[in-house]
């Protein structure tokens, strides 16, 4: 993935980031290339790991996740192995786990149905990973999943 992107690759990556369902024909028009050239470039971007997959964006509220929160976690015993991400990976309500610099070791993005469900989840996180937690409930999301592609 060290190979630099040329201008055409950047166009294709920007277009795919904006609409992962864009057809090869649409991409070809936007990039000024033939469909076969675009297909070859997209395959190369995929094999290099620049394009890592295609997925649908689901509205969390539409599937019953009415409450989202950031949960910062810190191991209770720093002398023990730092394996919190692996211990929490199976918990479905944990959408993302980020290693961070600062007071906490990790920040989790969690989605649950209610405040009570968050309380239960926090207890599971504490018990499963032997961590302390600090939660911030998300009131409104103005934007997310933005990708800057120079």
Swiss-Prot record:
DNA-binding stretch(es), residue numbering of this chain: 24-43
Gene3D superfamilies: 3.30.70.920, Winged helix-like DNA-binding domain superfamily/Winged helix DNA-binding domain (1.10.10.10)
Induction: 15-fold induced by starvation.
Ranges where the HTH asnC-type domain occurs: 5-66
Effect of residue 102 to T: Adopts an unusual open quaternary structure
Activity regulation: The DNA-binding activity of LrpA is modulated by interaction of LrpA with various effector molecules, including amino acids and vitamins. The DNA binding affinity is decreased by several amino acids, including phenylalanine, tyrosine, tryptophan, histidine, leucine and aspartate. Preferentially binds to aromatic amino acids. Besides amino acids, the binding affinity is also reduced by vitamins, including B1, B3, B6, VC, B7, B9, B12, VA and VK3.
Disulfide pairings: none
Any one Gene Ontology BP term: response to amino acid
PANTHER family noted in UniProt: HTH-TYPE TRANSCRIPTIONAL REGULATOR LRPC, LEUCINE-RESPONSIVE REGULATORY PROTEIN
Domain notes: Contains an N-terminal DNA-binding domain, followed by a rather long linker and a C-terminal effector-binding domain, which is also involved in oligomeric interactions. The ligand-binding loops of two crystallographically independent subunits adopt different conformations to generate two distinct effector-binding sites. Amino acids like phenylalanine, tyrosine and tryptophan exhibit binding to only one site, histidine exhibits binding to both sites.
Record's protein name: HTH-type transcriptional regulator LrpA
């Amino acid at each position: 993935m060290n190979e630099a992107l040329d201008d055409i690759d950047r166009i294709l990556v920007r277009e795919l980031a904006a609409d992962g369902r864009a057809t090869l024909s649409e991409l070809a028009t936007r990039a000024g290339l033939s469909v076969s050239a675009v297909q070859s470039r997209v395959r190369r971007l995929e094999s290099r790991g620049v394009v890592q997959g295609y997925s649908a964006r689901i509205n969390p509220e539409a599937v019953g996740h009415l409450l989202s929160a950031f949960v910062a976690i810190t191991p209770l015993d720093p002398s023990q192995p730092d394996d919190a991400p692996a211990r929490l990976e199976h918990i479905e309500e944990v959408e993302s786990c980020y290693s961070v610099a600062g007071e906490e070791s990790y920040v989790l993005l969690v989605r649950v149905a209610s405040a009570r469900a968050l309380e239960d989840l926090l207890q599971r996180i504490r018990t499963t990973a032997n961590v302390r937690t600090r939660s911030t409930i998300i009131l409104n999301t103005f934007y997310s999943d933005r990708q800057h592609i120079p």
